Each structure stands twice: as C-alpha cells, then as structure tokens.
C-alpha cells in the first residue's frame, strides 16, 4: 500500500495568513501525466469534503483561497487567506493505486 505522511500534524495560523500542509507519498502517485492526489477537509461529525483533486484542481464550489500543487511523491495544500471557517482537519488521499489511502491528517487551528 502507498503510505502518505502529512506534516505538520497540527498547525495554528493567524486569521488572514497562509496555512501550508505537506503530504509525502512512499511512491509516486503519477500516471500518464496526471498526479492522483486529492485533498479533503473534515469537520467533527461530518463526512470529508473534497477540496482539491488531481493535485491542483479545485472542486466545484470550493473557494479559490484553497490551492494544491506538487507531483510524484511531494504535494502541498495552501490556504490563503485563512478564514475562521477553515478550522478543521485536512487529509491528503492518493487515488492512483488500490487501496486508496489517506494521510494521518493535519488539524488546523485559527488564532
């Protein structure tokens, strides 16, 4: 299975500043020029919400302050400017190889 390592595990960012979350895969999640890395936001008691798919594509309805980048094994989620409603736990997920796997999560706190 592909192991995804997220960092940091928790993050406190001031309102209006930038939050940066990293995800490193144990092997490449690229295939035919596409990076099969996705990012989700989860609030307590709710299902995860897809933010970014294929490394850098913004899901419909998601604010443009969310952006994703990376390829191969190294990926980044940026949130800028951070808003209060962004306090949540964020997960990367690879969809290149079964079983699809998730990172351990990053809990974002807004100061």
UniProtKB/Swiss-Prot annotation:
Residues 54-60 are annotated as: Complementarity-determining-2. One of its GO terms (biological process) is immune response. Residues 102-111 are annotated as: Framework-4. Residues 1-23 are annotated as: Framework-1. Residues 24-38 are annotated as: Complementarity-determining-1. GO terms for cellular component: immunoglobulin complex. Disulfide bonds join 23-92. This chain was isolated from a myeloma protein. This is Ig kappa chain V-III region CBPC 101.
